[in-house]
Amino acid sequence: MRCGLCVALLLAGSALAAEQPEETGAERDALSSVHVAIARQDCAAAVARLNEGLARRYTGIYLMAGLMYEDGICLKPNWERAERLYLRAHAAGHRAGVLRLVAGQARNSRDPAAALWWAQQSKGMALPLPCGVPEPVWSDPARFVDALQAWPAGQLEACVYAAGVTAMVTGDAEYPATALDFQLAGRVEMTFEPAKGASAWRTIQIESLPMTGGVSADTLRDRNSRRVQQSLENYLRDGGDRALRQFTRPAAVPADWRLTVVFAFSFK
């Protein structure tokens, strides 16, 4: 059984596939080799494997390279290069490219207008209603900026904060290794309250899929353990906490803003 990263985001009652081009085995191996090298603190190997993947135009490597430039992982921090790589991922059809552009532009208020403009481009991204701009407006950059400038004081900052946190959580979500190893599918709900700077998480459903090959009693016991059964929720919770630490919550965020996203993990 193979996973084609089936992480769907269920927003406002409608299903939205986390779109990305089909990932080949070679691309998965390339990404894994970069992760392994970083974990070993072998930056020379990480950069070498990264460059090999970029030469082969692997979409996932574009995202990985962008993250490494954005966060200064084995590379000198360079937002302009990160931005170009996220744009390449977006052009190749990977939805996370847009989400990382939203988060990156929102981070440290790098470019608030650009953050919200990209948020409008992301199909179905969860945003508070006051943060939305009609398509005829956001399709015209000048009108879009004028619309943002007409907002009440504090609304732009509040919207950028909500968009940035949500985009980082959803853009960074991958199928966690533990769930893959134990063939778990399921759905996890995030409720983000921007005014509190907090997210609540709950597991809606967990499904243990048939495991192929010889399966030991120890493996089955581990699979039913709390650690494994909650691996999807714990993985997403860690990502949510990490995103909240990256953004400074503005003083004036409406108390009634709530964003709900359901992450649906499945195999195909």
PLM-predicted stretches and their roles:
Residues M1-A8:
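Sec-dependent signal peptide recognition
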Residues A8-A18:
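Hydrophobic h-region of N-terminal signal peptides that target proteins for export
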Residues A18-A30, A44-A48, E52-G53, E80-K268:
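Charge-biased low-complexity segments
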Residues L31-V36, Y62-D71, R100-R107:
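Hydrophobic face of amphipathic alpha-helices that form TPR/SEL1-like repeat modules
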Residues V36-A44, N78-W79:
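Helix-turn-helix repeat elements of alpha-solenoid scaffolds
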Residues A39, D71, L75, A91, ...:
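Alpha-helix C-terminal capping/termination sites
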